[in-house]
């Protein structure tokens, strides 16, 4: 009888904690005596992870913040690698956080430990040479999106497309009436969700632009109402300051982006992961983004993809309008969004097809792929 499995996982932020806990749960169903080590958040700890240190120590955003903590991050990684080599788990699974986990995978694979990376970094879009490090350090890549899997197949990296957990949790048809009732919005009133991003810099660059656009929409459609989910108390305070002196009928929500998307007819949205949520809720959208001019100039030369938004990358065509940098003016955004409030059927038909492709029971698919790599029976 084979010995109980020992699986090491490292997640670096809240989204990875969600993915990791779902994978752990699916693995335990198949092998109840499994043991988990590594680094995880509260959800992974609830599934039985013995975390070597708090996951929050890895949750660092921004170049300046990373540089300020670089010595600590490198020391933690070095100690973690040594601990895992001594423990000799059956497999190591790095969940997202590529700048931290890819190096661990490379060192562990050289030490004879099988490695899996769950959630592809955006190597298909920029810094494509990272795929060389992935090919050397990774026995298996698990991707959430199908076009990522095609890229790795072309690059000779073993890969499995497992689907996206959000596509599993968001229903194919959302309850618009229930969401509106919960927000106190009339069923017949047209509603636009404003989603200028979750980070302070994004809201600073896009918040005023989105409110200028809302004023132009309101001038053409006086019965229009707006909802804006705020990612944190800090973002809410920032948004409230940007709204001062404006007379806009906007309902601010604390979090609850899913409620805002379920309730609305169309979305004005910053490019980012929230566009996938909007797609899964089948809400017509216009994508906008602005960066510092130098940053935009550099990225424009580095990025290999013709599109920036996930809906277009998934559709492999221009399914949703993208207005970037100087093209993102209030007049252009309002003109593009207005017809979608009443009729976004072309977009939503494409969204429905993509949702069905992504809806693959991701956690169970990932668990089966990991167990197949180990030569263990994945069947229940």
Swiss-Prot record:
Name of the protein this chain belongs to: Lipid-A-disaccharide synthase
Organism classification: Bacteria, Pseudomonadati, Pseudomonadota, Gammaproteobacteria, Pseudomonadales
A Pfam entry, by short name: LpxB
GO molecular function: lipid-A-disaccharide synthase activity; phospholipid binding
Reaction catalysed by this enzyme: a lipid X + a UDP-2-N,3-O-bis[(3R)-3-hydroxyacyl]-alpha-D-glucosamine = a lipid A disaccharide + UDP + H(+)
UniProt-listed Enzyme Commission number(s): 2.4.1.182
SUPFAM superfamilies: UDP-Glycosyltransferase/glycogen phosphorylase
KW Ribosomal protein (keyword) present: no
One of the GO biological process terms: lipid A biosynthetic process
Source organism of this protein record: Pseudomonas syringae pv. syringae (strain B728a)
PANTHER family reported in the protein's UniProt record: LIPID-A-DISACCHARIDE SYNTHASE, LIPID-A-DISACCHARIDE SYNTHASE, MITOCHONDRIAL-RELATED
Entry GO CC: membrane
Main function: Condensation of UDP-2,3-diacylglucosamine and 2,3-diacylglucosamine-1-phosphate to form lipid A disaccharide, a precursor of lipid A, a phosphorylated glycolipid that anchors the lipopolysaccharide to the outer membrane of the cell.
Metabolic or biological pathway: Bacterial outer membrane biogenesis; LPS lipid A biosynthesis
UniProt superkingdom: Bacteria
């Amino acid at each position: 009888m084979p010995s109980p499995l020992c699986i090491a996982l490292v997640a670096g932020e809240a989204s990875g904690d969600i993915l990791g806990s779902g994978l752990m749960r699916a693995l335990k169903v198949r092998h109840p005596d499994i043991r988990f080590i590594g680094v995880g958040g509260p959800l992974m700890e609830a599934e039985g992870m013995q975390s070597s240190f708090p996951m929050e120590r890895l949750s660092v955003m921004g170049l300046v913040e990373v540089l300020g903590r670089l010595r600590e991050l490198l020391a933690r990684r070095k100690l973690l690698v040594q601990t895992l080599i001594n423990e000799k788990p059956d497999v190591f699974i790095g969940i997202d956080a590529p700048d931290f986990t890819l190096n661990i995978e490379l060192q562990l694979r050289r030490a004879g430990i099988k490695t899996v990376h769950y959630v592809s970094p955006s190597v298909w879009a920029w810094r494509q040479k990272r795929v060389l490090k992935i090919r050397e350090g990774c026995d298996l890549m698990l991707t959430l999106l199908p076009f990522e899997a095609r890229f790795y197949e072309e690059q000779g990296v073993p890969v499995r497309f497992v689907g996206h957990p959000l596509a599993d949790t968001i229903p194919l048809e959302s309850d618009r009436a229930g969401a509106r009732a919960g927000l106190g919005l009339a069923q017949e009133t047209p509603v636009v969700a404003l989603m200028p991003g979750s980070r302070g810099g994004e809201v600073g660059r896009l918040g005023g632009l989105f409110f200028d656009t809302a004023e132009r929409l309101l001038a053409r459609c006086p019965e229009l109402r707006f909802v804006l989910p705020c990612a944190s108390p800090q973002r809410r305070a920032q948004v409230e300051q940007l709204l001062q002196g404006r007379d806009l009928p906007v309902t601010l929500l604390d979090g609850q982006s899913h409620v805002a998307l379920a309730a609305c007819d169309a979305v004005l949205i910053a490019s980012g992961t929230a566009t996938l949520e909007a797609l899964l809720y089948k809400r017509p959208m216009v994508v906008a983004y602005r960066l510092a001019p130098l940053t935009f100039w550099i990225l424009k030369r580095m990025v290999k993809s013709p599109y920036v938004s996930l809906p277009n990358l998934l559709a492999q065509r221009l399914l949703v309008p993208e207005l970037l940098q100087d093209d993102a003016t209030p007049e252009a955004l309002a003109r593009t969004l207005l017809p979608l409030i009443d009729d976004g059927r072309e977009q939503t038909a494409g969204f429905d097809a993509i949702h069905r492709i992504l809806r693959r029971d991701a956690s169970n698919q990932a668990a089966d792929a990991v167990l197949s790599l180990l030569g263990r029976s994945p069947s229940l």
